[in-house]
């Protein structure tokens, strides 16, 4: 695991964190996964490739140094916690709707020496309406499996004007991106050229949809999630 991580990070032009922090993250994830559902991926090498290195690749897409970042629908902490471990100057918020996961993430950040990390149990469509969260972040990131029109409505309200929303997607997302153009514009965003990368040591190619926030998201967004699903923008 250690060699695979080091080689993968080197291929991404990143230095491994001290004290084997990411290896410890892998081990703690797999240990906790026996007690609660954190990931369907249980092979250690695949955890390295599909969680750790996939998340780390985002550091080549944008400058995260010293930035205020929110990871929406973080799950087991991907990509946010990996980004924080590799770039400790990030001011990180992890948001997830499952309380048990959020409690574990809070413990994990301390175990990895990544604290302080703000871990919030909540729904994005409600959290984005609150003062101190709306229009406050330099970067919103998400690896959540959801249509980009819905992800944009959930994530863009968190981003301040001049900031960016980064959505991690599969390589065949072009149609989805084109379909989301109208929604992104309505929410105050503007599509920028997508980034593309290959996960080191694999044949898997991924894309990152880059959206710049050029004006405030109008009042009334995000809507209730049921409404988003029923009538995407």
What are these regions (language model features)?
Residues 178-233:
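SAM/dcSAM-binding transferase cores
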């Amino acid at each position: 695991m250690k060699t695979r991580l080091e080689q993968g990070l080197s291929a991404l032009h990143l230095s491994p964190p001290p004290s084997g922090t990411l290896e410890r993250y892998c081990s703690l994830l797999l240990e906790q996964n026996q007690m609660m559902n954190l990931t369907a991926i249980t092979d250690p090498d695949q955890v390295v490739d599909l969680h750790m290195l996939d998340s780390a690749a985002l550091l080549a897409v944008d400058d995260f140094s010293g930035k205020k970042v929110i990871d929406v629908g973080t799950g087991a902490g991907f990509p946010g916690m990996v980004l924080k471990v590799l770039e400790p100057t990030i001011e990180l918020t992890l948001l997830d709707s499952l309380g048990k996961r959020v409690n574990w993430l809070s413990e994990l950040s301390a175990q990895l020496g990544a604290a302080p990390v703000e871990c919030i149990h909540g729904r994005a469509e409600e959290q984005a309406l609150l003062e101190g969260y709306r229009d406050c972040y330099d970067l919103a990131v998400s690896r959540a499996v959801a249509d980009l029109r819905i992800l944009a409505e959930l994530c863009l309200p968190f981003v301040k004007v001049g900031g960016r929303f980064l959505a991690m997607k599969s390589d065949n997302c072009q149609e989805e991106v084109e379909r989301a153009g109208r929604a992104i514009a309505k929410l105050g965003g503007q599509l920028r050229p997508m980034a593309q990368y290959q996960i080191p040591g694999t044949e898997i190619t991924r894309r990152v949809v880059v959206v710049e926030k050029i004006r405030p998201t109008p009042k009334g967004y995000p809507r209730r999630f049921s409404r988003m699903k029923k009538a995407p923008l």
